[in-house]
């Protein structure tokens, strides 16, 4: 890799120059997150749409003024005059809701200034621009009552009291709270309750048993029906329209369907180069026809046989779903409104098959869209789309205005390609996965070139031509009820740039692939099939000649950190080192210390993980803490002191069990962080330490240690000081690579070429990285989710805007 420049950690993993771009409801302004010029802290910037193109200029104004953690979750208020955003203290996730006038230099106002109280489930409405609805656990820390809040005056009034089991609230077109999602603590089921008015009694509309999936999208405009996604009667979720009063279903159906645009065949917009792209269109009907015997189901609108419903683009004035995204391996779209067919065709044609399209935001009237193009080997591009210009026939070049790239510095570097691969577990279960390979300046003619359009799915056909193998990092996503996806993953690119192959596996229990795949992971932590899937993926990479079996690292955060500890404890022969970020080590103490507001979901956690609190044998079997004696590989442990989900004790106890055993164990505690590392000094300090740790054990490249001035790290133990660290010598690295080349770089380049050649037989096909899913990047608008991580650690360590569970509801579906 001597011809591939080393990418500095700050370029890959520092704060992005631009992120979370949005358009104001009136379409006049563009907003985005950008570091402040003096503190490198993310804040909200605003520019007029007339000055949209290019990098920040004189028209751009920084409207928030955070100086420490930065703003990560924000939205426009419906008046287009205020920004509302959430902020916690030191990663404790006790979110406060703030408001900032965009035309004022005054400090932001804390609208929920209550100590120890968390704000979430925030709903806005275009017909009530002065108000928001917000959930607060002020009365009872275990549950959230809905309050009505005036943005300008700060007046707060109780709207709807929580009976104790409601985990999410929804408002209708009149801005009245009329639906609630309740959890049954006895069996883990979810019930959607509705009422016909603010003073009416609640009634149960639909129940999803613990093994089923369902969520609310929005009320229809008529208030007599509601859009949901549901897996009842099928494996993957589908978009459905339900009557909120089944007794009046025929009348509600006639009225709701009359409001919907006339549809011919539902259009599936996809790339022909995608090997499994057609799967996203399966289940697309010829119009809004019911496919369920449930009298509440008025129509079934969109579905795929391969994956669940992803993001839903909604007309917020008419309260109609316009298009639906599906993400199996890459993003595909089903367009429900025929008037948007030409728009999507134009937008998708602009970048072709090399990029995935997401609609980040829309003006209230739908005339201005803010779209993003994600690639696996380049920065994300944001553009402003003018529908009126497109209608005038000017084409993509005239209707699309380039806004900016999230990390423009990456344009100077060569990045690795991210290959979707369908792996097979030992029991035949298919595991959608992603393999990122180090970049090559060129592919030697003696090797097979990568094939961008393989003929069929699967992992057959991969293999090493030269016989040289790469070090491998198995990068395990958190959740575990989340997923990895396609697109730029800065953490994977960091490893690839250092000379490592990177394998990311959607193991069973990952979300988005249907309820069967999700629940195959129930009770399978640690020594079960969830961990077997990871081991099988490593075995595939070794067997295919991609990975050197002596140099495999396991890296992950949250559940991924648990998987790291489990891998080192239960399959110690497989890994030469590991990195555990905020990972639980003792399942009983994890379940016993969940946040109070997770109490309604406790039964769901027990059903999915196992009753480790009541079954001592199970707890001992799946908790890495009890198997510390089996660990023999070097390990880094990293923890945020204020983590409310995986408490500091989880890292303390595994470190205490390992220290003094003769192992190389390094433990880094960040005192002003929570479930991930939001502050760049801490993030870069951590990544620099990992950079050198992996170089030592995998033989890759590294940059000199970073000396961060404002980090909160406490190094509880270090095997070697970074000041004394010396990278492996060239001869040692070459020997480790198994190469005859006397140059370490020569051996690495040959191994890279061998792995690149193996691409020839892999199945590649598509889904936008991050999307509304996992990885979190578009987490605005999601309600409270329970899981060890949503979109971490990849988003956290890549400096993305979201590092925690997203807590704004009603700001999504996509505008």
Predicted stretch roles:
Residues 1-18, 57-60, 343-353:
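A short helix->beta-strand "capping" segment at the edge of beta-propeller domains
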């Amino acid at each position: 890799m001597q011809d591939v420049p080393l990418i500095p950690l700050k370029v890959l993993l520092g704060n992005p120059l631009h992120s979370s771009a949005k358009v104001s409801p009136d379409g006049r302004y563009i907003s985005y997150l950008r570091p402040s010029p003096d503190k490198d802290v993310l804040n909200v910037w605003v520019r007029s749409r007339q000055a949209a193109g290019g990098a920040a200029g004189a028209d751009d104004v920084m409207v928030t003024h955070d100086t420490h953690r930065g703003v990560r979750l924000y939205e426009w208020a419906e008046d287009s005059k205020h920004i509302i955003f959430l902020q916690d203290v030191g990663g404790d996730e006790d979110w406060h809701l703030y408001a900032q006038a965009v035309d004022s230099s005054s400090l932001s106002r804390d609208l929920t200034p209550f100590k120890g109280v968390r704000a979430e489930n925030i709903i806005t409405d275009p017909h009530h621009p002065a108000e928001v609805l917000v959930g607060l656990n002020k009365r009872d820390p275990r549950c959230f009552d809905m309050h009505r809040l005036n943005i300008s005056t700060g007046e707060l009034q109780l709207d709807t009291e929580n009976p104790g089991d409601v985990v999410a609230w929804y408002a209708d077109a009149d801005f009245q709270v009329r639906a609630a999602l309740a959890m049954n603590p006895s069996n883990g089921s979810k019930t959607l309750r509705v009422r016909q008015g603010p003073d009416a009694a609640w009634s149960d509309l639909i129940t999803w048993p613990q093994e089923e999936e369902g969520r609310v999208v929005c009320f229809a405009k008529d208030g007599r029906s509601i859009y949901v996604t549901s897996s009842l009667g099928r494996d993957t979720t589908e978009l459905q329209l339900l009557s909120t009063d089944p007794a009046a279903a025929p009348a509600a159906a006639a009225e709701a369907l009359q409001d919907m645009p006339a549809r011919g065949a539902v259009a599936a917009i996809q790339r022909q180069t995608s090997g499994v792209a057609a799967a996203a269109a399966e289940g697309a009907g010829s119009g809004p026809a019911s496919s369920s015997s449930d009298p509440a189901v008025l129509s079934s609108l969109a579905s795929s046989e391969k994956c669940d419903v992803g993001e839903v683009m909604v007309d917020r004035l008419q309260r109609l779903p316009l298009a639906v995204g599906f993400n199996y391996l890459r993003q595909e779209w089903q367009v429900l409104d025929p008037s948007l067919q030409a728009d999507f065709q134009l937008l998708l044609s602009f970048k072709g098959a090399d990029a995935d399209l997401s609609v980040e935001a829309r003006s209230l009237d739908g005339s201005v869209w803010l779209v993003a193009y994600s690639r696996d080997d380049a920065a994300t591009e944001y553009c402003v789309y003018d529908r009126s210009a497109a209608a005038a026939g000017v084409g993509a070049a005239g209707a699309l205005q380039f806004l900016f790239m999230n990390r423009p510095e990456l344009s100077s570097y060569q990045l690795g390609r991210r290959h979707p691969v369908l792996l097979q577990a030992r029991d035949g279960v298919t595991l959608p996965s992603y393999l990122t390979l180090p970049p090559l300046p060129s592919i030697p003619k003696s090797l097979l070139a990568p094939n961008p359009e393989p003929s069929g799915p699967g992992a057959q056909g991969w293999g090493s031509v030269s016989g040289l193998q790469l070090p491998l990092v198995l990068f395990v996503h958190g959740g575990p009820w989340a997923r990895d996806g396609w697109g730029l993953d800065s953490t994977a690119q960091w490893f690839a740039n250092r000379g490592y192959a990177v394998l990311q596996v959607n193991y069973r229990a990952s979300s988005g692939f249907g309820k069967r795949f999700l629940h195959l992971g129930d009770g399978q932590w640690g020594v079960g099939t969830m961990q077997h899937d990871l081991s099988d993926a490593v075995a595939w990479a070794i067997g295919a000649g991609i990975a050197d079996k002596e140099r495999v690292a396991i890296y992950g955060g949250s559940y991924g950190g648990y998987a790291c500890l489990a891998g080192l404890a239960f399959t110690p022969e497989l890994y030469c080192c590991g990195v555990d970020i905020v990972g639980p080590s003792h399942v009983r103490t994890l379940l016993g210390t969940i946040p109070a507001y997770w109490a309604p979901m406790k039964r769901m956690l027990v059903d999915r993980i196992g009753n480790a609190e009541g079954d001592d044998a199970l707890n001992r079997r799946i908790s890495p803490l009890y198997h510390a004696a089996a660990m023999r590989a070097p390990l880094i442990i990293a923890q945020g002191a204020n983590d409310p989900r995986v408490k500091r004790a989880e890292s303390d106890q595994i470190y205490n069990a390992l220290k003094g055993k003769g192992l190389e164990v390094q433990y880094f505690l960040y005192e002003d962080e929570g479930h991930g590392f939001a502050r760049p000094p801490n993030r870069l300090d951590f990544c620099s330490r990992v950079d050198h740790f992996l170089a030592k054990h995998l033989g890759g490249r590294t940059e000199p240690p970073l000396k961060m001035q404002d980090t909160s790290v406490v190094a509880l133990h270090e095997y070697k000081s970074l000041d004394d660290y010396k990278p492996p010598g060239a001869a040692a690295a070459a020997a480790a690579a198994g190469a005859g080349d006397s140059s370490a770089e020569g051996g690495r380049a040959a191994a890279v070429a061998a792995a690149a050649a193996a691409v020839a037989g892999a199945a590649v096909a598509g889904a936008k990285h991050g999307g509304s899913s996992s990885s979190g990047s578009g987490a605005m608008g999601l309600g409270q989710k329970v899981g060890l991580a949503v979109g971490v650690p990849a988003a956290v360590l890549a400096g993305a805007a979201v590092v925690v569970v997203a807590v704004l509801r009603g700001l999504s579906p996509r505008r």
